Amino acid sequence: MAEAVGAVALIAAPARRRWLWSVLAAMLGLLTARISALEVHTPKEIFVVNGTQGKLTCTFDSPNTTGWLTTVSWSFQPDGTDSAVSFFHYSQGQVYIGDYPPFKDRVTWAGDLDKKDASINIENIQAVHNGTYICDVKNPPDIVVRPGHIRLHVVEIDNLLVFLVWVVVGTVTAVVLGLTLLISLVLVVLYRRKHSKRDYTGCSTSERLSPVKQAPRKCPSDTEGLVKSPPSAGSHQGPVIYAQLDHSGGHHSGKINKSESVVYADIRKD
């Protein structure tokens, strides 16, 4: 009996090992397939007035939902240094703030992991807070991530007003220059079109329809010969009656008017 049980156990052992390896391979494949790069988005730089609250905005994109394993860490790299100091950590709904003096009792959580927002607020910002802030988010299995960097500038209220004035002046100047350039281009185009029409040497429609005045050709006719021929001796020439005809279509007609003298009768008395 014992020998039979041992034989069954020996036969089942390889099958069990194959089953375990299959399960592990499937789990590993599923885990590998779900791993993807988590993208963090932050503004490149922000300006905050000295003594006011500043919000460091940080959002992220992840194909996986957030949960208890999602963590957020903020670090600070002061100006002129190469190393960063971690001063804020958020995990499982809890906020952990370090003992770094510039941020003690100044930092509050302003994000919402359900909306994939990892922002924070810093109260009473001072000149010591000038530097680069680093937002790092982990959302397993999304572990491949590039942190976001924000360059924070602390400015005085007077400097900020001057900066805003220069921004407005620059914007208005750019708009005025753009409009001036556009108007100049339009005027140049209209000027060229106008002068191109003046320089055109072809015949226009009005020119084709306008009459050309020519010197009347004198063609001797019988009547003119009779009129101009000197009277023969002993003959008595009577009065010559002339008439002037106006070959026009009417007073308001657009036709060309032409007038000429026609000899209608030559009365002679012998």
UniProtKB/Swiss-Prot annotation:
- Which first-to-last residue range defines the signal peptide? 1-35
- Any one cellular-component term (Gene Ontology): membrane
Residue numbers bearing the Phosphoserine modification: 204, 206, 210, 221, 261
Membrane topology, as annotated, equals: Single-pass type I membrane protein
Which Cys residues form disulphide pairs? 58-135
> Could you list the residue ranges that cross the membrane?
163-183
From what superkingdom does this record's organism come?
Eukaryota
Indicate the quaternary assembly: Interacts with phosphorylated PTPN11/SHP-2.
Q: Which family does it belong to?
A: Belongs to the myelin P0 protein family.
- The record's note on its domains: Contains 2 copies of a cytoplasmic motif that is referred to as the immunoreceptor tyrosine-based inhibitor motif (ITIM). This motif is involved in modulation of cellular responses. The phosphorylated ITIM motif can bind the SH2 domain of several SH2-containing phosphatases.
Record's function text: Cell surface receptor, which is involved in signal transduction processes. Recruits PTPN11/SHP-2 to the cell membrane and is a putative substrate of PTPN11/SHP-2. Is a major receptor for concanavalin-A (ConA) and is involved in cellular signaling induced by ConA, which probably includes Src family tyrosine-protein kinases. Isoform 2 seems to have a dominant negative role; it blocks tyrosine phosphorylation of MPZL1 induced by ConA. Isoform 1, but not isoform 2, may be involved in regulation of integrin-mediated cell motility.
**The protein's name:** Myelin protein zero-like protein 1
Give the taxonomic lineage as stored in the record: Eukaryota, Metazoa, Chordata, Craniata, Vertebrata
Q: Which gene encodes it?
A: Mpzl1
